[in-house]
Amino acid sequence: MDSGSGFDPDTGNNKGNGSGGGNGYGERKFGAFFKRVEPFLPKKDLNPRDLRSWAKKTGFVSDYSGETSTSTRTKFGESSDFDLPKGRDQVVTGSSHKTEIDPILGRNRPEIEHVTGSEPVSREEEERRLNRNEATPETENEGGKINKDLENGFYYPGGGGESSEDGQWPKPILMKFGLRDNPGFVPLIYYGLQHYLSLVGSLVFIPLVIVPAMDGSDKDTASVISTMLLLTGVTTILHCYFGTRLPLVQGSSFVYLAPVLVVINSEEFRNLTEHKFRDTMRELQGAIIVGSLFQCILGFSGLMSLLLRFINPVVVAPTVAAVGLAFFSYGFPQAGTCVEISVPLILLLLIFTLYLRGVSLFGHRLFRIYAVPLSALLIWTYAFFLTVGGAYDYRGCNADIPSSNILIDECKKHVYTMKHCRTDASNAWRTASWVRIPYPFQWGFPNFHMRTSIIMIFVSLVASVDSVGTYHSASMIVNAKRPTRGIVSRGIALEGFCSLLAGIWGSGTGSTTLTENIHTINITKVASRRALVIGAMFLIVLSFLGKLGAILASIPQALAASVLCFIWALTVSLGLSNLRYTQTASFRNITIVGVSLFLGLSIPAYFQQYQPLSSLILPSYYIPFGAASSGPFQTGIEQLDFAMNAVLSLNMVVTFLLAFILDNTVPGSKEERGVYVWTRAEDMQMDPEMRADYSLPRKFAQIFGCRCC
């Protein structure tokens, strides 16, 4: 450049000639015509997101490392300003998320045009921009990205979403119908029934396990099934209106199944000869009522909001997994009583859910949605043809005669097979009424004892932890912001009230949120509350049909056990899937989960090895549930000994206690632990969409004087 030119490289203006004269420059030194150049210092912390002069002047937006332009973000629905309840295709205005650098550091378009002109940029503005750049974090690890996205409510983990091929974060799940969508009355009926049909294994198979264990008749089994259908409908409607208001079915949970079997097979109840079913059911009713009251207090008092600070995915994952693993000694040993039915059923379930999961018929993935009812129906039909064809006809053997009255050993074996395999072994159809309305205290007034009440208090705590994980996962799947701690507490309190109803009506187990809801919503892509309410109304009507309960009670026990093997395995996988919110490669996390699961199985096995003296009268698959009366915990206080031996023989309770203590005492960052970050109540008050999703019905809220509850 000519030394006489006064060209300013920043503004592009000529400042005049450099020679002396009347310009006033003659007295200045030659170097005064140019800005002083600072010594060059190499920048070691290079950030590719920092924009250079050309990008600043033109408004260029980088596509580096997952950054997208506005148009790209609109196309794929990955904007942080995305209005989730209205669908991912709608973008609202606002400041962009960290994955996008706005033109010229967040300034609007008129200011961009202003910069590209010939007017100089003031030094103060330049310094302000540089300070703003320095305030931006230069690098972010994956854990930080996940935690930030979770805090903003815009990160959708892999629970149902397909991973992108380029290694980016999974996309949000595109739902057919959102939380408040109303597709019309006829579609609501279809999708409502579809939701409950996909959960049929969890809704009706528990009575097929507990009622025969209590020596109940086939008629009693049909009555308990009808009661469960009624309570499922009522409690689901209550939850959709007064609980968390997420589209979650309430019903008899497997969390309560293991403790119920422990009480049933304890020495005090397994040796009853008269009225064994009614006496045992009344004992269970009293224990469930006490446990439900504890859960109500936990929710309504606000203690649950405090407890939520210590409940994280590292605690939830092994606890829910232990619920399914608790029945590994019951599952196939019971199903193996009729292998010609159980093995084909398990294989068919695996084929439908794994190999044919992508096959669509008439636009519906029937094999994923209806895998359980379709498989059970096909194998039940197959078992019917085996029965009609005489496969289980043994000369001189009658399944109606009690085993104790049969003298021939070979005939005893055949009778055992006939009871578990024949489709006509049940007399529920002949004995059940056409119309039967379940009513409160139908088995008599409940019995209250400290030993069983302590058991159910621990179980209700585990059920609450299970529900917390389900609430969080469901809110992420349905593309809604996560609820506040108060809403979660409200949901837990309502679950306690629902369990209270279950204890009063005598369903045999408590009522809680079914973990399988996550799988159902994920495969049906339907999250409409109205659909669940319509389906629940149908369940209430069907519960009055006594013959329907009789048909379900006629399902062979081997068939029911085979379906439960698959559902319990699904429960394990759904529980472990909560780890996707954490850093799964963390040695801390995998150690806590591994130790909790292993000791959660091993410690109860130590208590279960103290078999009862009368173990010969118990089938092998019931022996692990008979440790309450003969366990090693002996203090001389009979009630306390019974309760502690029973509690420490439950896999899920031991696993929860270990995971809870370890996760909250071993140091770890929030990103590493995947800490649940719930929405603040203040944010909910300012968000009309969130209030519409979670707030109580307006008239009900006005009665209690709460505006945003």
Curated annotation (Swiss-Prot):
Q: In which tissues is it expressed?
A: Expressed in leaf primordia and vasculature of pedicels, rosette leaves, sepals, carpels and siliques. Expressed in the root central cylinder.
TM segments?
Answer: 196-216, 222-242, 246-266, 288-308, 310-330, 336-356, 369-389, 454-474, 532-552, 555-575, 590-610, 642-662
- Ranges of compositional bias, category Basic and acidic residues: 75-89, 108-132, 142-151
Q: Where is the composition biased (Polar residues)?
A: 65-74
| Keyword set includes Transmembrane helix | yes
Q: What is its main location?
A: membrane
Gene label: NAT11
Q: Which InterPro entries does the record cross-reference, listed alphabetically?
A: NCS2 (IPR006043)
Q: What is this protein called?
A: Nucleobase-ascorbate transporter 11
* Organism of provenance: Arabidopsis thaliana
